[in-house]
Amino acid sequence: MAFSDFSLTVLGSRGSMAFGGEQCSRYGGDSSCYMVRAGEETVFLDSGTGICAAPSSYPKDPVVLLTHLHLDHIVGLGMFPALSNRELRVKIYVPFCRTREEAEGSLGRIYAPPFWPVRLTEYTSSPELLPLPDQLTLGALQIDAIPGNHPGGCMVFRLRYEGKSIVYVTDYEYEESSFERLVRFAEGADLLLFDAQYEDAELPAKHGFGHASAGQGIELMERSDAKRLLLIHHDPQSFDRVLAQRETLLTHKKVEYARTGQRIVL
């Protein structure tokens, strides 16, 4: 990778829980994790099981941004290879916290005995657990965060680098005022990632579950003038044949369902 690149790699795009087997071999079964490279900066969006396949070394200390703390978005963190690299100091930004102590306590409820053998702060890389700010600057990479709409809360991210931008909207349920805010937040994005766990017809029965559909993602893409849409957070029961069938019904050339291993260079 040239250090001037701005890219996103899908390490996992399954929602709610990971699911393996041949029926998930095309789109992947690992839960939410996306690796963004911006020059020498590396940022991971969430840390589901997909982060277990991430590299162990980086040009600079990697950063993990968590949208929320539901298990499917943090369950891979304990097996993140970089945490065992003593030459790195991983920074993990935790939402809905005001202090380092709150950030450590939030993840410490899971990553500590008896649920996990060691605390995250005891790993070789001595990672820093920090409260997630509304804005974060990493070299030339600018990151903004706003709240979405999901039970318990979930953050939405926009990453800007050298005139290009990625917007990450996972675990989002349509609500008029928050959707209007998303339209403004995603304006002109080069790549929009959007939760499409359900089909439009399923949404009434899934009200309150905190997820969206491809149709709503396309509406956001069109209203915000985003250039490309990647549909994410696949339902555990939406196997390859289901997602492939849904993909054949898409009429937009710049809309597709995410696949594990897929790399998009902006």
Indicate where each model-derived feature is located:
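Binuclear metal-dependent hydrolase catalytic cores
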Residues: 1-167, 182-183, 243-266
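Cap/insert and terminal regions of metallo-dependent hydrolase folds
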Residues: 174-261
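Short strand-loop junctions, especially beta-strand C-caps/beta-turns
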Residues: 95-97, 171, 234
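Active-site flanking residues adjacent to catalytic metal/cofactor-binding acidic residues
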Residues: 45, 67, 169-170, 194-196, ...
